[in-house]
Amino acid sequence: MKPIILMFIMLTIFMGTMLTMISSHWLLMWVGLEINMLAIIPILMKKISPRSTEAATKYFLTQATASMLLMFSIVINTANSGQWGITNMHNQLTSLVTMAALMMKLGMTPFHFWVPEVTQGISLMSGMLLLTWQKLAPISILLQIFPSMNPNIILLIAILSILVGGWGGLNQTQLRKILAYSSIAHMGWMMAILMYWPSLTMLNLLIYLMLTITLFSVLNINTNTTTLTLSNTWNKTPMITLTILISLLSLGGLPPLTGFLPKWTIIQELTKNSNIMLATIMAIMALLNLYFYMRLIYSTSLTMFPTLNNMKMKWQFQQTKQIFLLSPLVILATLTLPLSPALLTLN
Protein backbone atom coordinates (compact mmCIF):
# COMPACT_ATOMS: atom_id res chain seq x y z
CA MET A 1 0.00 0.00 0.00
CA LYS A 2 1.35 3.40 -0.98
CA PRO A 3 2.16 5.76 1.90
CA ILE A 4 -0.16 8.50 0.63
CA ILE A 5 -3.08 6.05 0.48
CA LEU A 6 -2.27 4.70 3.94
CA MET A 7 -2.12 8.24 5.33
CA PHE A 8 -5.49 9.08 3.78
CA ILE A 9 -7.08 5.93 5.22
CA MET A 10 -5.66 6.58 8.70
CA LEU A 11 -6.95 10.17 8.54
CA THR A 12 -10.40 8.87 7.59
CA ILE A 13 -10.37 6.43 10.53
CA PHE A 14 -9.38 9.28 12.86
CA MET A 15 -12.11 11.57 11.52
CA GLY A 16 -14.78 8.86 11.82
CA THR A 17 -13.87 8.18 15.44
CA MET A 18 -13.73 11.87 16.33
CA LEU A 19 -17.12 12.48 14.68
CA THR A 20 -18.65 9.78 16.85
CA MET A 21 -16.98 10.99 20.04
CA ILE A 22 -17.99 14.66 19.70
CA SER A 23 -21.54 14.13 18.44
CA SER A 24 -24.69 14.31 20.54
CA HIS A 25 -26.91 13.53 17.53
CA TRP A 26 -27.70 9.89 16.82
CA LEU A 27 -27.43 10.18 13.04
CA LEU A 28 -24.02 11.88 13.07
CA MET A 29 -22.79 9.33 15.59
CA TRP A 30 -23.94 6.47 13.38
CA VAL A 31 -22.28 8.05 10.32
CA GLY A 32 -19.00 8.33 12.24
CA LEU A 33 -19.16 4.64 13.15
CA GLU A 34 -19.74 3.69 9.51
CA ILE A 35 -16.87 5.85 8.26
CA ASN A 36 -14.64 4.21 10.83
CA MET A 37 -15.75 0.70 9.89
CA LEU A 38 -15.37 1.13 6.12
CA ALA A 39 -12.00 2.87 6.40
CA ILE A 40 -10.34 0.14 8.47
CA ILE A 41 -11.19 -2.70 6.07
CA PRO A 42 -8.32 -1.81 3.64
CA ILE A 43 -5.98 -1.79 6.67
CA LEU A 44 -7.08 -5.31 7.56
CA MET A 45 -6.40 -6.42 3.97
CA LYS A 46 -3.08 -4.58 3.66
CA LYS A 47 -1.29 -7.89 3.11
CA ILE A 48 -3.34 -9.65 0.46
CA SER A 49 -3.92 -13.29 1.41
CA PRO A 50 -6.90 -15.63 1.77
CA ARG A 51 -6.71 -15.35 5.57
CA SER A 52 -6.75 -11.55 5.61
CA THR A 53 -9.59 -11.49 3.08
CA GLU A 54 -11.59 -13.91 5.22
CA ALA A 55 -10.86 -11.87 8.35
CA ALA A 56 -11.93 -8.61 6.68
CA THR A 57 -15.13 -10.26 5.41
CA LYS A 58 -16.00 -11.56 8.89
CA TYR A 59 -15.31 -8.14 10.36
CA PHE A 60 -17.47 -6.38 7.77
CA LEU A 61 -20.43 -8.75 8.16
CA THR A 62 -20.37 -8.51 11.95
CA GLN A 63 -20.00 -4.74 12.04
CA ALA A 64 -22.66 -4.27 9.35
CA THR A 65 -25.09 -6.36 11.41
CA ALA A 66 -24.30 -4.26 14.48
CA SER A 67 -24.82 -1.07 12.47
CA MET A 68 -28.21 -2.28 11.25
CA LEU A 69 -29.27 -3.08 14.81
CA LEU A 70 -28.08 0.33 15.97
CA MET A 71 -29.96 2.15 13.20
CA PHE A 72 -33.08 0.08 13.99
CA SER A 73 -32.97 1.16 17.63
CA ILE A 74 -32.25 4.78 16.65
CA VAL A 75 -35.28 4.92 14.34
CA ILE A 76 -37.59 3.38 16.96
CA ASN A 77 -36.29 5.73 19.65
CA THR A 78 -36.73 8.77 17.40
CA ALA A 79 -40.26 7.69 16.47
CA ASN A 80 -41.19 7.39 20.15
CA SER A 81 -39.47 10.50 21.49
CA GLY A 82 -39.48 12.75 18.42
CA GLN A 83 -35.85 13.77 19.08
CA TRP A 84 -32.44 12.68 17.76
CA GLY A 85 -30.57 13.48 20.97
CA ILE A 86 -28.44 10.66 22.30
CA THR A 87 -29.60 11.14 25.89
CA ASN A 88 -33.29 10.85 24.97
CA MET A 89 -33.54 7.07 25.30
CA HIS A 90 -36.33 5.96 27.59
CA ASN A 91 -37.71 2.92 25.76
CA GLN A 92 -36.54 -0.40 27.23
CA LEU A 93 -36.54 -2.12 23.82
CA THR A 94 -34.34 0.51 22.18
CA SER A 95 -31.93 0.44 25.12
CA LEU A 96 -31.61 -3.34 24.85
CA VAL A 97 -31.07 -3.32 21.07
CA THR A 98 -28.58 -0.46 21.31
CA MET A 99 -26.66 -2.33 23.99
CA ALA A 100 -26.56 -5.47 21.82
CA ALA A 101 -25.26 -3.47 18.84
CA LEU A 102 -22.52 -1.80 20.88
CA MET A 103 -21.51 -5.09 22.52
CA MET A 104 -21.19 -6.59 19.03
CA LYS A 105 -18.98 -3.71 17.91
CA LEU A 106 -16.81 -4.05 21.01
CA GLY A 107 -16.61 -7.84 20.66
CA MET A 108 -18.04 -8.62 24.08
CA THR A 109 -19.84 -11.79 25.14
CA PRO A 110 -22.12 -13.16 23.68
CA PHE A 111 -21.03 -11.40 20.48
CA HIS A 112 -17.33 -12.14 20.87
CA PHE A 113 -17.07 -14.85 18.20
CA TRP A 114 -15.48 -12.63 15.55
CA VAL A 115 -12.67 -11.09 17.63
CA PRO A 116 -10.18 -14.03 17.84
CA GLU A 117 -10.76 -15.13 14.24
CA VAL A 118 -10.36 -11.66 12.75
CA THR A 119 -7.31 -10.84 14.88
CA GLN A 120 -5.64 -14.11 13.92
CA GLY A 121 -6.09 -13.49 10.19
CA ILE A 122 -4.47 -10.05 10.02
CA SER A 123 -1.01 -8.62 10.67
CA LEU A 124 0.22 -7.58 14.10
CA MET A 125 -0.06 -3.85 13.50
CA SER A 126 -3.54 -4.20 11.99
CA GLY A 127 -4.49 -6.28 15.02
CA MET A 128 -3.19 -3.54 17.29
CA LEU A 129 -5.40 -0.99 15.52
CA LEU A 130 -8.39 -3.32 15.73
CA LEU A 131 -8.02 -4.03 19.46
CA THR A 132 -7.21 -0.45 20.51
CA TRP A 133 -8.44 2.41 18.33
CA GLN A 134 -11.63 0.63 17.24
CA LYS A 135 -12.78 0.45 20.87
CA LEU A 136 -12.88 4.22 21.34
CA ALA A 137 -16.02 5.10 19.38
CA PRO A 138 -18.38 2.45 20.86
CA ILE A 139 -17.14 3.11 24.41
CA SER A 140 -17.71 6.86 23.94
CA ILE A 141 -21.34 6.07 23.08
CA LEU A 142 -21.68 3.77 26.10
CA LEU A 143 -20.36 6.48 28.40
CA GLN A 144 -23.21 8.75 27.27
CA ILE A 145 -26.13 6.32 27.29
CA PHE A 146 -25.34 3.98 30.21
CA PRO A 147 -27.83 5.68 32.63
CA SER A 148 -30.71 4.46 30.45
CA MET A 149 -29.48 0.85 30.35
CA ASN A 150 -30.36 -2.03 32.64
CA PRO A 151 -27.50 -2.35 35.17
CA ASN A 152 -28.14 -6.06 35.74
CA ILE A 153 -27.69 -6.85 32.05
CA ILE A 154 -24.49 -4.79 31.92
CA LEU A 155 -23.05 -6.64 34.92
CA LEU A 156 -24.05 -10.01 33.43
CA ILE A 157 -22.32 -9.16 30.14
CA ALA A 158 -19.25 -8.00 32.07
CA ILE A 159 -18.98 -11.23 34.07
CA LEU A 160 -19.49 -13.40 30.98
CA SER A 161 -16.88 -11.41 29.04
CA ILE A 162 -14.30 -11.85 31.81
CA LEU A 163 -15.08 -15.57 31.96
CA VAL A 164 -14.93 -16.12 28.18
CA GLY A 165 -11.81 -13.95 27.88
CA GLY A 166 -10.02 -16.10 30.44
CA TRP A 167 -11.43 -19.47 29.42
CA GLY A 168 -10.89 -19.00 25.69
CA GLY A 169 -7.21 -18.14 25.99
CA LEU A 170 -6.22 -21.19 28.03
CA ASN A 171 -5.39 -23.57 25.17
CA GLN A 172 -4.08 -21.01 22.67
CA THR A 173 -0.57 -20.93 21.23
CA GLN A 174 -1.19 -18.06 18.81
CA LEU A 175 -0.23 -14.75 20.39
CA ARG A 176 -2.80 -12.76 18.42
CA LYS A 177 -5.64 -14.96 19.65
CA ILE A 178 -4.36 -14.69 23.21
CA LEU A 179 -4.39 -10.90 22.96
CA ALA A 180 -7.87 -11.03 21.41
CA TYR A 181 -9.24 -13.00 24.36
CA SER A 182 -7.39 -10.62 26.67
CA SER A 183 -9.21 -7.75 24.99
CA ILE A 184 -12.57 -9.44 25.63
CA ALA A 185 -11.71 -9.84 29.32
CA HIS A 186 -10.55 -6.24 29.68
CA MET A 187 -13.76 -4.98 28.08
CA GLY A 188 -15.62 -6.94 30.75
CA TRP A 189 -13.68 -5.18 33.52
CA MET A 190 -14.53 -1.81 32.00
CA MET A 191 -18.23 -2.62 31.76
CA ALA A 192 -18.34 -3.87 35.37
CA ILE A 193 -17.40 -0.46 36.77
CA LEU A 194 -19.28 1.64 34.19
CA MET A 195 -22.43 1.97 36.32
CA TYR A 196 -20.54 3.08 39.44
CA TRP A 197 -17.60 5.19 38.28
CA PRO A 198 -17.50 6.11 34.55
CA SER A 199 -14.23 8.00 34.96
CA LEU A 200 -12.57 4.80 36.17
CA THR A 201 -13.77 3.11 32.97
CA MET A 202 -11.91 5.78 30.99
CA LEU A 203 -8.77 5.30 33.11
CA ASN A 204 -9.00 1.54 32.63
CA LEU A 205 -9.36 2.05 28.88
CA LEU A 206 -6.31 4.33 28.80
CA ILE A 207 -4.16 1.78 30.64
CA TYR A 208 -5.44 -1.04 28.43
CA LEU A 209 -4.52 0.98 25.32
CA MET A 210 -1.00 1.62 26.64
CA LEU A 211 -0.41 -2.04 27.50
CA THR A 212 -1.80 -3.43 24.25
CA ILE A 213 -0.01 -0.94 22.00
CA THR A 214 3.27 -1.63 23.81
CA LEU A 215 2.89 -5.40 23.53
CA PHE A 216 1.91 -5.37 19.86
CA SER A 217 4.74 -2.96 19.02
CA VAL A 218 7.34 -5.11 20.75
CA LEU A 219 6.00 -8.32 19.20
CA ASN A 220 6.14 -6.68 15.77
CA ILE A 221 9.89 -6.06 16.06
CA ASN A 222 10.66 -9.78 15.75
CA THR A 223 7.34 -10.70 14.08
CA ASN A 224 6.44 -13.00 16.95
CA THR A 225 3.05 -14.60 16.30
CA THR A 226 3.26 -17.94 18.15
CA THR A 227 4.63 -19.28 21.40
CA LEU A 228 7.28 -21.16 19.43
CA THR A 229 8.70 -18.06 17.72
CA LEU A 230 8.57 -16.18 21.01
CA SER A 231 10.57 -18.86 22.81
CA ASN A 232 13.29 -18.78 20.15
CA THR A 233 14.01 -15.04 20.38
CA TRP A 234 16.07 -15.09 23.59
CA ASN A 235 19.26 -15.58 21.61
CA LYS A 236 18.45 -12.86 19.10
CA THR A 237 16.98 -10.00 21.13
CA PRO A 238 17.01 -10.84 24.86
CA MET A 239 16.03 -7.34 25.98
CA ILE A 240 13.05 -7.25 23.62
CA THR A 241 11.96 -10.68 24.87
CA LEU A 242 12.30 -9.52 28.48
CA THR A 243 10.18 -6.47 27.65
CA ILE A 244 7.50 -8.75 26.19
CA LEU A 245 7.44 -10.87 29.33
CA ILE A 246 7.18 -7.86 31.66
CA SER A 247 4.41 -6.41 29.49
CA LEU A 248 2.54 -9.71 29.74
CA LEU A 249 2.82 -9.62 33.53
CA SER A 250 1.52 -6.06 33.52
CA LEU A 251 -1.38 -7.05 31.27
CA GLY A 252 -2.17 -9.84 33.71
CA GLY A 253 -2.46 -7.32 36.55
CA LEU A 254 0.44 -8.27 38.81
CA PRO A 255 1.82 -5.65 41.22
CA PRO A 256 3.91 -3.51 41.15
CA LEU A 257 3.26 -3.08 37.41
CA THR A 258 0.83 -0.67 35.77
CA GLY A 259 -1.77 -3.32 34.94
CA PHE A 260 -2.45 -3.85 38.65
CA LEU A 261 -3.94 -0.35 39.01
CA PRO A 262 -7.26 -0.84 37.14
CA LYS A 263 -8.02 -4.21 38.74
CA TRP A 264 -7.18 -2.89 42.19
CA THR A 265 -9.32 0.24 41.86
CA ILE A 266 -12.26 -1.60 40.24
CA ILE A 267 -12.38 -4.26 42.96
CA GLN A 268 -12.07 -1.54 45.63
CA GLU A 269 -14.93 0.47 44.11
CA LEU A 270 -17.18 -2.57 43.76
CA THR A 271 -16.52 -3.43 47.40
CA LYS A 272 -17.44 0.12 48.47
CA ASN A 273 -20.75 -0.27 46.63
CA SER A 274 -21.54 -3.51 48.54
CA ASN A 275 -20.83 -5.74 45.54
CA ILE A 276 -18.41 -7.98 47.40
CA MET A 277 -19.63 -11.15 45.68
CA LEU A 278 -19.21 -9.60 42.22
CA ALA A 279 -15.71 -8.36 43.08
CA THR A 280 -14.77 -11.82 44.37
CA ILE A 281 -16.05 -13.55 41.23
CA MET A 282 -14.16 -11.11 38.99
CA ALA A 283 -10.94 -11.55 40.98
CA ILE A 284 -11.21 -15.34 40.72
CA MET A 285 -11.91 -15.24 36.98
CA ALA A 286 -8.96 -12.89 36.47
CA LEU A 287 -6.76 -15.81 37.52
CA LEU A 288 -7.64 -17.51 34.23
CA ASN A 289 -6.04 -14.65 32.29
CA LEU A 290 -3.08 -14.61 34.63
CA TYR A 291 -2.63 -18.35 34.12
CA PHE A 292 -2.14 -18.21 30.36
CA TYR A 293 0.12 -15.17 30.68
CA MET A 294 2.25 -17.08 33.17
CA ARG A 295 2.18 -20.13 30.91
CA LEU A 296 3.54 -17.96 28.08
CA ILE A 297 6.29 -16.66 30.34
CA TYR A 298 7.16 -20.16 31.55
CA SER A 299 7.33 -21.64 28.05
CA THR A 300 9.39 -18.70 26.82
CA SER A 301 11.93 -18.34 29.60
CA LEU A 302 12.24 -21.78 31.18
CA THR A 303 11.72 -24.25 28.33
CA MET A 304 12.89 -24.83 24.77
CA PHE A 305 10.43 -26.16 22.24
CA PRO A 306 11.36 -29.40 20.44
CA THR A 307 12.67 -28.15 17.10
CA LEU A 308 15.42 -29.20 14.75
CA ASN A 309 18.93 -28.34 15.93
CA ASN A 310 19.59 -26.09 12.97
CA MET A 311 16.39 -24.15 13.67
CA LYS A 312 16.98 -23.31 17.32
CA MET A 313 19.17 -20.31 16.64
CA LYS A 314 17.71 -17.45 14.66
CA TRP A 315 19.97 -15.64 12.23
CA GLN A 316 21.27 -12.30 13.41
CA PHE A 317 19.68 -10.18 10.72
CA GLN A 318 20.11 -6.43 10.95
CA GLN A 319 17.25 -4.78 12.76
CA THR A 320 15.15 -2.82 10.27
CA LYS A 321 11.89 -2.24 12.13
CA GLN A 322 11.92 0.92 14.19
CA ILE A 323 9.04 1.61 16.57
CA PHE A 324 8.42 5.26 17.36
CA LEU A 325 8.29 6.13 21.08
CA LEU A 326 8.74 2.50 22.15
CA SER A 327 10.82 3.30 25.24
CA PRO A 328 8.28 5.72 26.79
CA LEU A 329 5.51 3.22 26.03
CA VAL A 330 7.36 0.44 27.85
CA ILE A 331 7.92 2.70 30.87
CA LEU A 332 4.26 3.74 30.96
CA ALA A 333 3.11 0.14 30.57
CA THR A 334 5.16 -1.13 33.49
CA LEU A 335 6.04 1.62 35.97
CA THR A 336 2.98 3.87 36.30
CA LEU A 337 1.61 2.31 39.51
CA PRO A 338 3.37 4.83 41.85
CA LEU A 339 1.42 7.57 40.07
CA SER A 340 -1.92 5.96 40.93
CA PRO A 341 -2.90 8.50 43.65
CA ALA A 342 -2.47 11.34 41.18
CA LEU A 343 -4.36 9.47 38.44
CA LEU A 344 -7.27 8.69 40.76
CA THR A 345 -7.38 12.31 41.91
CA LEU A 346 -7.79 13.41 38.30
CA ASN A 347 -10.90 11.24 38.09
Swiss-Prot record:
Catalytic activity: a ubiquinone + NADH + 5 H(+)(in) = a ubiquinol + NAD(+) + 4 H(+)(out)
Keywords: Electron transport, Membrane, Mitochondrion, Mitochondrion inner membrane, NAD, Respiratory chain, Translocase, Transmembrane, Transmembrane helix, Transport, Ubiquinone
Entry keyword 4Fe-4S: no
Cellular-component GO terms for this entry: mitochondrial inner membrane
Catalytic activity, EC: 7.1.1.2
Keyword Flavoprotein attributed: no
Places the protein is found: Mitochondrion inner membrane
Membrane-spanning parts: 3-23, 25-45, 59-79, 96-116, 127-147, 150-170, 193-213, 240-260, 274-294, 323-343
Any one Pfam family match given in the protein's UniProt record, by short name: Proton_antipo_M
Biological processes per GO annotation: mitochondrial electron transport, NADH to ubiquinone; mitochondrial respiratory chain complex I assembly
GO MF: NADH dehydrogenase (ubiquinone) activity
UniProt topology in membrane: Multi-pass membrane protein
EC category: translocase
Principal place of residence: mitochondrion
Self-association state and partner proteins as the record states: Core subunit of respiratory chain NADH dehydrogenase (Complex I) which is composed of 45 different subunits. Interacts with TMEM242.
Family note: Belongs to the complex I subunit 2 family.
Role this protein plays: Core subunit of the mitochondrial membrane respiratory chain NADH dehydrogenase (Complex I) which catalyzes electron transfer from NADH through the respiratory chain, using ubiquinone as an electron acceptor. Essential for the catalytic activity and assembly of complex I.
Protein known as: NADH-ubiquinone oxidoreductase chain 2
Organism of derivation: Lemur catta (Ring-tailed lemur)
